[in-house]
């Protein structure tokens, strides 16, 4: 499920800094033992992002497992104001709830829609780590690897992904268009190199393969993509395509 908090008025403050502050605020609302448990997880069962609109600032919290929903949902629902260190207290205008259940993902996978092109909008700085180094330009392999890992661990309870499937997806997908820029995400005193923008790719192969890609990407709108999605990195959305 997705939990979206809409803060009244627009906060004139950098979204990346707000995302880290909001994450700290969220952790303060939870039991310390549960926070320790979350820090030990290989893949965090939640993701957050901050989106600056013209009229308001949205703090979006994605709860990705039943366990964290049980622990966090009511806490989020009861928040009336937010204190972020040195910033003025913020009033919560409304809480919007969107759901993405297993039945919806299965419906996407079983759909007869034969979509070939997919466009990803990277709303917040997105990055990967490969062989110990930061990667500031996406490859189809890194995109699918991240989505498959998050989906496998959080939905299917599978710690490892199928390398053959990853190879097949990567070999049958080609980037056709992109408009990306380097973007740094600051966590405390560390500047993490990343990217933002838009990327379009084509999938060649059976309809089932394309449906699997659509399912992974739809899940990715909730799970985030790449590293540090719990802190606000890797927020993505799919652009609706008519082809």
Predicted regions and their residues:
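RNA-interacting cores
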Residues: 1-243
